Amino acid sequence: MNILAIGAHPDDLDISCGGTLLRFGQAGENVVMCVVTDGRAHPLGDPEQVSARRRKEAQASADIVGAELVWLGFPDGRLTDDIPARLRFIELLMRVSPDLIITHSPDDYHSDHMLTSRLVTATIQMAWAPPPELAGDPVRKQVPVAFMPPAYGINFLPEEYVDISDVWDQKLQMALSHRSQYLPGPDYDAPLQEPLEQYAFARYTRITDEFYGQQCWCRYAEAFRWWRAADRLVPRRLLP
């Protein structure tokens, strides 16, 4: 299968579905990790340097999965649902031809998250019969969309779980690849210190995955809901 995971920011996929992507990769599936914005909205540092740093971190994380990284480069914090953005999303869908899409919940807390979700659901049907100015093959198959939990799982009732206990240490390394988000800098390449849970990303990842693991009787899990719409449902389990 072609698995397309679409996150608004460079670290979103790692935290919310990194374990699931690792399991897909281990099963031999083709995994594509798409980062929609350029990550420049950081309170410290030159925006161009911050963006370059965050792209490097995202690539390091994708390498752990063995995934292809797609960097769309929209301005961080300024994503809009407009025709140019929709065309970029349609091009992405046509190029990857996904069998499954994983993305943000439509009611997540951040505008970039909400708009990423909206752009996915707005363009997947358009990729069936794409605008004439776009070259490539249309996506003429049912493509289910799985929504990741919003931050802290607020107002999110899971429908399916993925046991990530066996890959959780690798998922933690994915999350910790994004050093610019939890280290004070400027030396983001300094060795990490034990215990790793002194870092906010490590604490949040463990607490969240243990929470969902408790719900389905395993140590660590990730949780998902399905977009329930015409042409988006299939009579089989797709998640690993």
Predicted features and spans:
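Metal-dependent de-N-acetylase/amidase catalytic core
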Residues: M1-L4, G45, D81-P240
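Active-site rim/loop-helix segments in enzyme catalytic domains that contact anionic ligands
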Residues: M1-V96, R225-W226, D231, P235-R237
